[in-house]
Curated annotation (Swiss-Prot):
Monomer. This is Porphobilinogen deaminase. It comes from Erwinia tasmaniensis (strain DSM 17950 / CFBP 7177 / CIP 109463 / NCPPB 4357 / Et1/99). HAMAP family: Porphobil_deam. Its cofactor is dipyrromethane. One of its GO terms (biological process) is protoporphyrinogen IX biosynthetic process. GO terms for molecular function: hydroxymethylbilane synthase activity.
Length: 313
């Protein structure tokens, strides 16, 4: 492999580049002498910033160009934020490694307030996520939730300009960019259940590229992979897309997995929650079982109502 350059397809945003450079460093540390280069790309999700993701095709807009680069042979792997990775992959591609997870919780960011509960009535809160919007609205129906797109720096800039009283971002993204001091509160999962895979970095690759898959094995973090597989199994069974508020969060203690999930309406008026506990070996089964319980308890009707207006991407 010493003569070959391993090329990483990545988005150009600061956070995406951080993730790609992290994988680059890890690969070189694990395989001294390996040559690794980045192939930064602009995706449709980076270009369409004036429309909520749910209306323009969902988070898959952030990965399609990267996948095309791998299929064409111009890139060998793609590095993704796991919360942006759709449940299905194009033929010939697959997820081959998940790196150790950063804090998966949501972050409350504000200049004048310390938490959602401290916000005054009618305060303006920015978020690009229907999952966050749903849980915020259920907790504080008096708040005004406004769409907020763009990279982390752009979103913080809009808060700093006074367009919002507070914004909700991912703790992981802020920490990775050295902006952890902007976090006023790490929101507990009981208040804001994280997104599927939030805080984890995944590596996608051509499934016939055995040599590259072998190189990536050292980067896979088994505990994170177990937790994310349970969360993604739930989402897959729900056929969840960006148009529906879905949260899923798994914790692993010793060999016992605790998986929580929710499906809600965007306005927060309807919300179905559930949880499962069991051995880590049953991670995917637990995800499927929890999804089926949620569907039986009302999630099916919520999903149908939302998709009637926005067919899944």
């Amino acid at each position: 492999m010493s003569d070959k350059i391993l090329r990483i397809a990545t988005r150009r945003s600061p956070l995406a580049l951080w993730q790609a450079e992290y994988v680059q460093r890890r690969l070189i540390a694990c395989h001294p002498g390996l040559r690794v280069e980045l192939l930064p790309m602009v995706t449709r999700g980076d270009v369409i910033l004036d429309t909520p993701l749910a209306k323009v095709g969902g988070k898959g807009l952030f990965v399609k160009e990267l996948e095309q680069a791998m299929l064409s042979g111009s890139a060998d792997i793609a590095v993704h934020s796991m919360k942006d990775v759709p449940v299905a992959f194009p033929p010939g591609l697959g997820l081959v490694a998940i790196c150790e997870r950063e804090d998966p919780h949501d972050a409350f960011v504000s200049h004048h307030y310390t938490s959602v509960d401290s916000l005054p009535q009618g305060a303006i809160v920015g978020t690009s996520s229907l999952r966050r919007q749903c849980q915020l609205s259920a907790r504080r129906p008096d708040l005004v939730i406004r769409s907020l797109r763009g990279n982390v720096g752009t979103r913080l800039g809009k808060l700093d300009a006074g367009e919002y009283d507070a914004i909700i971002l991912a703790v992981a993204g802020l920490k990775r960019l050295g902006l952890g001091d902007r976090i006023r509160q790490v929101m507990p999962a009981e208040e804001s259940l994280p997104a599927v895979g939030q805080g984890a970095v995944g590596i996608e690759c051509r499934l016939d590229d055995i040599q590259t898959i072998a190189l990536l094995a050292a980067l896979n973090h088994s505990e994170t992979a177990c937790r994310v597989s349970a969360e993604r199994a739930m989402n897959t069974r729900l056929e969840g897309g960006c148009q529906v508020p879905i949260g899923s969060y798994a914790l692993l203690e010793d060999d016992q997995l605790w998986l929580r999930g929710l499906v809600g309406s965007p306005d927060g008026n309807e919300m179905v929650r559930g949880e499962r506990r069991g051995p880590r070996a049953d991670a995917e089964k637990m995800g499927i079982s929890l999804a089926e319980e949620l569907l039986e308890n009302g999630a099916r009707d919520i999903l149908a109502a939302v998709y009637q207006g926005n067919p899944p991407a």
